């Protein structure tokens, strides 16, 4: 129950909103400069807050607490952060991360986040760190068995995604690799609250993968369409091809009423992808004829162990996480789907943070 009540709710706030709108319109007609000054003042306040005062607030009322772990003996240039929660995902996520760490001369950081209810002090979570360690130690053992540098990280947070994002920033992660259980039924979320937030605000490259009960990466389908995200996905596919012996198939979707030029363009895109990503010539080429691109990829992907694709390019103000086609493929495919998203830069990330 709230600590106070607003008289005549909701009439009072509605009247206040109406009066403020009237005042704003009247002020604009009286002197438009006041609008510009106000807008500039608000933007300056936001910039100053995020650059300076936010750190002071965080110090007084931390949203995330880091639990000290042994420092690495060697500083690696590439760090892969794997948030772990589901014990069934440990092996497949480590199988994917290990060759990437080996390729880029990096290490794997397995992260456990202890979530504390909002009505409890965040430091209460420190008492439960022993319950997270067995899961993390299992991943560390996998890394040790495969000669991949692996260490643990622990965070306590009121919200799991805050713990993941804070760890990624503090550890200067190059890549976040995380699994997800499937789509949520809530309309304002796509992959679930945690995954949605991490995808939107990740400070580095990101891979999210929908895993199945039994995971194998012997046959991988790569839809090619160009763009920075798809190019990065193809580079990762080349790593899996060499390290895991995966058989790769590049595909391109053309319309049913395609022209000869459309087919030539498809071959050009596939050859460009293979050449620039480092895939070898054993890659199969596949042209799909369909008017619905996502449905064609889902149908083709049913014969593969994994569909690996890059996110679509979206505008800076877009609410779409990966793009319409990748999200539909992830939603409707029964097979594992991996979506790769390259870091979009500080400016775009800042705008998305301000807009929420």
Language-model segment annotations:
Residues 2, 32-82, 131, 146-149, ...:
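Membrane-interfacial segments at transmembrane helix termini in multi-pass membrane proteins
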Residues 113, 155-162, 288-294:
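Charged docking surfaces used in two-component/phosphorelay signaling
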Residues 44-49, 53, 167-214, 301-356:
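Gly/Ser-rich helix-loop-strand patches that form or flank binding pockets
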Residues 124-207, 218-219:
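Cytosol-/stroma-facing membrane-proximal "stalk/adaptor" domains immediately downstream
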Residues 25-39, 317, 321:
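Extracellular/periplasmic helix-loop-helix junctions in multi-pass membrane proteins
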Residues 70-131, 135, 142, 150-153, ...:
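Small/aliphatic-rich secondary-structure junction motif
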Residues 270-272, 289-301:
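A short, acidic, amphipathic alpha-helical segment used as a generic capping/interface helix at domain edges
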Residues 1-31:
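C-terminal membrane-solvent junction of multi-pass transporters and transport-like membrane proteins
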């Amino acid at each position: 129950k709230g600590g106070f009540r607003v008289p005549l709710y909701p009439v009072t706030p509605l009247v206040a909103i109406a009066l403020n709108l009237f005042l704003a319109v009247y002020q604009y007609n009286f002197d438009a400069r006041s609008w510009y000054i106000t807008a500039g003042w608000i933007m300056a306040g936001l910039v100053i807050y995020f650059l300076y005062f936010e750190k002071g607030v965080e110090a007084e009322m931390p949203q995330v607490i880091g639990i000290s772990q042994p420092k690495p003996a060697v500083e690696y240039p590439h760090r892969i952060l794997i948030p772990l929660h589901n014990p069934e995902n440990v092996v497949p996520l480590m199988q994917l991360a290990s060759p990437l760490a080996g390729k880029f001369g990096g290490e794997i950081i397995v992260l456990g986040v202890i979530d504390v209810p909002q009505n409890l002090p965040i430091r209460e979570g420190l008492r439960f760190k022993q319950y997270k360690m067995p899961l993390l130690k299992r991943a560390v053992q996998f890394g040790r068995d495969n000669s991949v540098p692996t260490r643990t990280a622990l965070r306590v947070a009121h919200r799991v995604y805050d713990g993941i994002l804070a760890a990624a920033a503090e550890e200067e992660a190059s890549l976040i690799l995380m699994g997800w259980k499937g789509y949520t039924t809530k309309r304002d979320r796509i992959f679930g609250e945690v995954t949605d937030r991490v995808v939107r605000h990740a400070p580095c490259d990101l891979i999210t993968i929908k895993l199945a009960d039994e995971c194998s990466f012997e046959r991988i389908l790569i839809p090619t369409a160009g763009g920075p995200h798809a190019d990065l996905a193809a580079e990762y596919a080349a790593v899996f091809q060499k390290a895991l012996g995966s058989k790769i198939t590049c595909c391109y979707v053309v319309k049913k009423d395609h022209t000869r030029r459309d087919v030539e363009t498809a071959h050009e895109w596939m050859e460009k992808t293979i050449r620039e990503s480092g895939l070898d010539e054993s890659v199969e080429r596949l042209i799909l004829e369909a008017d619905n691109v996502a449905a064609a990829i889902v149908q083709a992907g049913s014969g593969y162990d994994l569909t690996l694709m890059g996110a679509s390019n979206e505008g800076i103000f877009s609410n779409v996480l990966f793009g319409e086609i990748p999200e539909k493929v992830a939603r409707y495919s029964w097979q594992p789907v991996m979506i790769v998203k390259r870091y979009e830069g500080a400016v775009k990330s800042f705008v998305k943070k301000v807009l929420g």
